[in-house]
UniProtKB/Swiss-Prot annotation:
Cofactor: [4Fe-4S] cluster; hybrid [4Fe-2O-2S] cluster
Keyword terms, alphabetized: 4Fe-4S, Cytoplasm, Iron, Iron-sulfur, Metal-binding, Oxidoreductase
Matching SUPFAM superfamilies: Prismane protein-like
This protein's record includes keyword Ribosomal protein: no
Organism placement in taxonomy: Bacteria, Bacillati, Bacillota, Clostridia, Eubacteriales
Reactions accelerated catalytically: A + NH4(+) + H2O = hydroxylamine + AH2 + H(+)
Family: Belongs to the HCP family.
Gene name of the encoded protein: hcp
GO CC terms in record: cytoplasm
Biological function: Catalyzes the reduction of hydroxylamine to form NH(3) and H(2)O.
Residue positions where Cysteine persulfide is found in the record: C403
Protein name per its UniProtKB record: Hydroxylamine reductase
Superkingdom to which the source organism belongs: Bacteria
Cofactor: binding comment: Binds 1 [4Fe-4S] cluster.
Pfam family of the protein (one): Prismane
Length: 549
């Protein structure tokens, strides 16, 4: 069986990639990722049985999290690294089995699809199995759709859990749920209704995961605050850090202090500037470039080393191949991968030494952008915001969180932001902001018309803000507030955000630029009928719809 992947918005023809991923992953990489998911379900099976006899292994929890994160779109293209993880997972599974058996447990449980017992000794055996366990192994279209909706939610949740765990914050209940759910989506006895309920329950734990990460980030680095971020360059050599992991950012800033090397953020690392703890670093120079999909040009013109801490990495170009490093879940064949020691410390000295030999970044723009409007900062402005709503100065909020991407159709979001009436405010998080965060959209009574809460996980902040506004205005539901949801999605973190919003009862969310290919017509119908999920059409008609005109 050839590869099949339809987990991201850009999947071929909005149906699925079957020869090579639009993201750039090869058939072999797609298949080894499928196999990694399969053996991770096997490890989860044994972990579930372990919990029944009192065995909770934090290393196993971490392995499950890391395995899921690695398979997120644009995270890891390194076949050998993923194959090694498959082998390591099989070893961990067998070791855990022995411990469960010694405690009197049944280590393989129901062993759905043989995931707790299958093994291999050669690469050929692995690839043969990989061809049998992909998405299309589930023949029923609706069951497949629901299973993948849940699976992609778990992948997004895994990303948020990994970042929280890197900062020493954890929640066993989330790990237990994830392991149980990985096994349930192999269970052919579960009906579509039961899987739909499981998808919403995944959203509940998505909220827990985002809350945990918010606590981890803010307790470690302080609450984000209103910040102006330089988008120009200095004359020193620099290191560009991309992705989402704030712990990696902290270690890089510590190690570059006093070296004469500046640090710039890229993409989803931009919100690092909003945290008080990072403002003490004079060499934290600014943000370089835009969203992930423009990295081919921007990494070339940056001139210095690039550190990818998480997705999104795209196929590496010759113009910067010798300057790009990966860490964490990221991998790309031929790039140096930096691992942490047993204490979580990463030595970035080789990146720093390389930076010293490089030219300063080439300037591609100048000026400043403003962000830092996470829940704590916005609630500090609550009186000002409430007064503006009551006076009519603010007519409506538009949640335009989510992702950016290559598709020309995403220009819709820039045009939508430009044409919004001057009495509206955009609430955003994630890299979708790059479509409009540099536009001169002005302010309302001193409140910027684009309030950037931060990274995609900071969509949690937008939920907290909405719930607080509902409380202030005395409404029974966030759906009664003057808030519309026009969200751009791309990958699996957007899926867990969506499921979290649905769990919280948010209705009438519009997704674009296309609805997910993994939603079968029947599953899409359920989401439309029960939650008011919709797509987008064109700016003029959609704006009339949102504004009730």
């Amino acid at each position: 069986m050839s590869m099949f992947c339809f987990q991201c918005q850009e999947t071929a023809g909005c149906k699925g990639c079957t020869v090579r991923g639009v993201c750039g992953k090869t058939e072999d990489v797609a298949k080894i990722q499928d196999l990694l998911i399969f053996v991770t379900k096997g490890l989860a099976t044994v972990a579930n049985e372990g919990r029944k006899v009192g065995i909770v292994d934090k290393k196993v929890n971490r392995m499950i999290i890391d395995n899921l994160f690695i398979t997120i779109t644009n995270a890891n293209f390194d076949f050998k690294a993923i194959e090694k993880r498959v082998k390591d997972t099989l070893v961990a599974r067998e070791e855990l089995k022995e411990r469960v058996q010694a405690k009197g447990g049944n280590p393989i449980g129901s062993d759905f699809k043989g995931c707790a017992t299958w093994t291999a000794t050669t690469s050929e055996e692995m690839m043969e199995k990989a061809s049998q366990v992909g998405v299309l192994a589930t023949e029923n279209e609706d069951i497949r759709s629901l299973r993948e909706l849940i699976m992609y939610g778990l992948k997004g949740l895994a990303a948020y859990m990994e970042h929280a765990m890197n900062l020493g914050h954890d929640k066993e209940e989330v790990h237990a749920f994830m392991a149980e759910t990985l096994v349930k989506i192999l269970d052919d006895s579960l009906s579509a209704d039961e899987l739909t309920a499981l998808a919403l329950e995944t959203g509940k734990f998505g909220v827990d995961g985002m809350a945990l990460l918010d606590e981890a980030n803010t307790s470690t680095y302080g609450h984000p605050e209103i910040t102006k971020v330089n988008i120009g360059v200095r004359n020193n050599p620099g290191i560009l850090i991309s992705g989402h992991d704030l712990k990696d950012l902290e270690m890089l800033l510590e190690q570059t202090e006093g070296t004469g090397v500046d640090v710039y953020t890229h993409g989803e690392m931009l919100p690092g500037h909003y945290y008080p703890k990072f403002k003490k670093y004079a060499h934290f120079a600014g943000n370089y470039g835009n969203a992930w999909w423009l990295q081919n040009k921007e990494f070339a013109s940056f001139n210095g080393p690039i550190l990818m801490t998480t997705n999104c990495i795209t196929p590496v170009q010759d113009s910067y191949r010798g300057r790009i490093f990966t860490t964490g879940a990221v991998g790309y064949e031929g790039c140096i991968h930096i691992t942490a020691d047993e204490n979580g410390y990463k030595d970035f000295s080789q990146i720093i030494e390389l930076a010293k030999t490089c030219k300063a970044p080439t300037e591609i723009e100048t000026g400043e952008i403003v962000g830092g409007f996470a829940h704590n900062q916005v609630l500090a402005l609550a009186d000002q915001v409430v007064d503006a709503v009551k006076s009519g100065a603010i007519r409506r909020f538009f949640v335009m969180a989510g992702c950016d991407g290559r598709a020309k159709s995403r220009d819709y979001y820039r045009e939508f932001a430009e044409k919004l009436p001057k009495d509206t405010v955009i609430l955003t998080a994630g890299c979708a902001k790059y479509k409009y965060n540099k536009l001169p959209l002005g302010d309302i009574n001193g409140i910027p018309r684009v309030l950037d809460a931060g990274q995609c996980n900071d969509s949690y902040s937008l939920v907290v803000i909405a719930l607080k506004l509902a409380e202030v205005f005395g409404t029974d539901s966030v759906n009664e507030l003057p808030i519309s949801y026009n969200i751009a999605w791309y990958e699996q973190k957007a899926v867990i955000v969506l499921l979290s919003l649905l769990h919280l009862g948010v209705k009438n969310i519009h997704l674009g630029p296309t609805l997910p290919a993994f939603l079968s017509p029947n599953v899409a119908k359920v989401l439309v009928e029960n939650f008011g999920i919709g797509g987008i059409t064109n700016v003029e008609d959609d704006m009339k719809m949102f504004l009730g005109e």
